[in-house]
Amino acid sequence: MAFLQSAYLVMVFTVPIAGVILNTYVLRKLIRVARKSVVRFETTSGLPLAAMSVGDSITLCALLMQAIFHITPKGEVPTVVLSSICKFGIFLIHSTSAFSVWCWFFLSVLRYIAVFHPFKYRTIWRQPRNALKFLAGAVGMFQIYTLIFVTYRQEEKSCGEYDVFHESAFKHVHLLDIFLFYAIPSLLRITLDFLVLIHCYSPFSVEGLDRVTIDRRYAISGPATTKRFSHTGETDTLDNKAHVALAISITASTNTPSVKRIHHGNPKKKTAMVMRSILISVLNLLLNLPSHIFRAWASYDESSLENEIVRTLEPIAQMMYFSQFACNAFYLATSIYETNGSPRNTVISSSNRHVSRCISDDEA
């Protein structure tokens, strides 16, 4: 038990610092991408990855702030100041961690669209930015309840809730919080990632796969040289050194699709990339689960948490919760694959539509 407590205290201070360092590295890399092309940054996974990185950094800083707050002598500090620190810290932790969970779901949505609707994926424009704005606003509005519930409890010398809220029906808000910001996005992520997995992953060699499956694998990673079009006709060139010619032909009367594809890259590598992203996503869910179970348990029967076995397991659950941020940072640091794609010639076709993208490789 003492060992677990010591390990927990070490993680409280080391994980936030390490996580902020990793996220700073990720943000610097993404900023370089954004400077080269804002459109490329906003219409690929760059924007949600950056949003997740910022959210995780704020969460880690808030966790570190709370850890320092609890070991710092309070002296004659007014209770109203201590309560304000508690409110602000808990609000930041809840809001940014909930936002991060939905960002994971957002990445799963992008994977799903890339696999099952590759043409739509190539024509994404303002949707990611607008979705993240709405998500941030909705999460912030919901988590306002923490500013009302949380206070500094003199008896325990720690942050907690007012008794009037903890002992009333208001405690059900915690269950709603868990349901909206863990259960729902987690189930949706599992569903979408499972569909992508069964469509894109095969234990057999690439030669044995049908061409459509292989091409859908390629849709996961954005090219380094392409053009994206806005609804107003604006274009953005992602690589000024490459000569890009985009030819779009639409034949409404074609019943048999005409497909011509020349690929650059390794399909197995792209499949492994998808698998890695999904596995890290599942690991993140598992690391979150014990903490949410204890939180839901405490909402209904806090006295049972005094059991010796439960008191032993709770630090482990907390350590798993802190570990998720290292998991997030690892994902962010290793999965910015859309910023490093290689040029490719692609034709995307459906039953009555033929779209051709031709890329000159003179300087590739």
From Swiss-Prot:
Q: Does the keyword Ion transport apply?
A: no
Topological type in the membrane? Multi-pass membrane protein
Q: Where are the transmembrane segments?
A: 2-22, 49-69, 90-110, 131-151, 178-198, 278-298, 316-336
Q: Which GO terms describe its cellular component?
A: plasma membrane
Q: Keyword set for this entry? A: Cell membrane, G-protein coupled receptor, Membrane, Receptor, Transducer, Transmembrane, Transmembrane helix
Name the source's superkingdom.
Answer: Eukaryota
User: What biological processes does GO assign it?
Assistant: neuropeptide signaling pathway
Quick one: where is this thing mainly located?
membrane
One GO term in the molecular function aspect is: G protein-coupled peptide receptor activity
Q: Name one Pfam family in it.
A: 7tm_1
PANTHER family to which the protein is assigned, alphabetical: CARDIOACCELERATORY PEPTIDE RECEPTOR-RELATED, G-PROTEIN COUPLED RECEPTORS FAMILY 1 PROFILE DOMAIN-CONTAINING PROTEIN
Kindly provide the name given to this protein in its UniProt entry: Probable G-protein coupled receptor AH9.4
